Amino acid sequence: MTDDVDTHIHEKFDLQKRLGKGAYGIVWKAYDKRSRETVALKKIFDAFRNPTDSQRTFREVMFLQEFGKHPNVIKLYNIFRADNDRDIYLAFEFMEADLHNVIKKGSILKDVHKQYIMCQLFRAIRFLHSGNVLHRDLKPSNVLLDADCRVKLADFGLARSLSSLEDYPEGQKMPDLTEYVATRWYRSPEILLAAKRYTKGVDMWSLGCILAEMLIGRALFPGSSTINQIERIMNTIAKPSRADIASIGSHYAASVLEKMPQRPRKPLDLIITQSQTAAIDMVQRLLIFAPQKRLTVEQCLVHPYVVQFHNPSEEPVLNYEVYPPLPDHIQLSIDDYRDRLYEMIDEKKASFKRIQHEKIRPYGEDKSRAPIAQAECSDTDYDTARSLQRTTSMDKNNSSSHDSSSGTLRERAASAESRTSKDSNGEMRNGNGNTPSSIKQRRRSVERARLFANIKPSKILHPHKLISNY
């Protein structure tokens, strides 16, 4: 195990256990001698073997540097060069399991865990989308969990800035996921049908697939090929109109769908049985053919399925667009990516080109403050625990009173964003007149441990039996 590691890495870390090894790398559970923390140490083999892999490595590091301070995004602690100048080491925060392995274990997750996981995923994706960035590779193995059921989103190798995608000349097809070995089971119809342009809806589709997989215990659309994947989707979701098909901007969509063999349909509500009505409704509203008709992440956060965990003060957004420091709409040389990454290692930080929005994002962020500092959340999971404790005592019939129409969800999303305001001193106040300082004091109360105990599923997850996947 240790023979594959450079000497200078051994000097920094005690390798405790190999968590996994694949064609592209190896991951250890390691002890950081300097910080005295347990980390996940990932060695990427031949990170700069070709321009495609070089660009993916570069993207992952750059986007993690920008988004890693969100409580639901995996933190990249450090980056280390390898002696051979081909490999690279990444030190991440350690997480006990990933959602893929948890689902494989069977009936580990209860309904409340699934709701809590989805709410945290929506928070993470809202943060990315507010910076105009798509993750593009959302799947259960990229959703990491700890014993407290806290979620961390990982693997940003396919993430792209929407602004950089818009730099493509009119009529030129944007790069799709076929350049990488990406899991097709979670791809949206517009990607499968080679759309000329795609939107934040690609991530929302993937989130719908993840939720469905948690509900039924297996992948919803396990296609064996691109065509088979499209067939499985079209035999399940609501039939799109001609306008819906035209809206994705694919030259092939109409002809492919017309030639598709007709098989008996099996709607989602017949596949996802023994689940809450709100859960089925959310899946149906996410798995819609036309991207513009899918729920947005803001609407998801106020949907009845997860609204019990919704707290606007715990859902930060960015007030600028995120660009990687190298052009992302063209592929550069291996040396370009490697040299820039090494410069960043030497500088201990990455520079992002930031374009300030004319209109400040919700919650009245102060432009004079550092953007990442604005985005930090303190004691996020404590407030979530409080929310859970309150909602578990509520009448179960309350959820039926929610109007699940898209219009109502939009109104709730807008209402939630207006719940906070600033006082005369510039300090944020919520709808009850509380300031962050007063809330923070309450968070430090002796009730903290008791509240966390109400959601801590460590006795259920048995994280030591699960395999992490970074």
Curated annotation (Swiss-Prot):
Expressed in the URX neuron and in many other head sensory neurons. Isoform a: Expressed in head and tail ciliated sensory neurons, and in mid-body neurons. Isoform c: Expressed in head and tail ciliated sensory neurons, and in mid-body neurons. A motif (TXY) lies at residues 178-180. GO terms for cellular component: axoneme; cell-cell junction; ciliary basal body; ciliary membrane; cytoplasm; dendrite; nucleus; perikaryon. The keyword Nucleotide-binding applies. The modification Phosphotyrosine is found at Y180. It is found in: Cell projection, Cilium; Cell projection, Cilium membrane; Cytoplasm, Cytoskeleton, Cilium axoneme; Cytoplasm, Cytoskeleton, Cilium basal body. Transmembrane segments: none annotated. Atypical MAPK protein. Regulates primary cilium formation in sensory neurons and the localization of ciliary proteins involved in cilium structure, transport, and signaling. Acts in dopamine (DA) neurons to support synaptic membrane dat-1 availability via activation of rho-1 thereby sustaining normal levels of DA clearance. Plays a role in male mating behavior, probably in part through regulating the localization of the polycystin pkd-2. This is Mitogen-activated protein kinase 15. It comes from Caenorhabditis elegans. The lineage of its organism: Eukaryota, Metazoa, Ecdysozoa, Nematoda, Chromadorea.
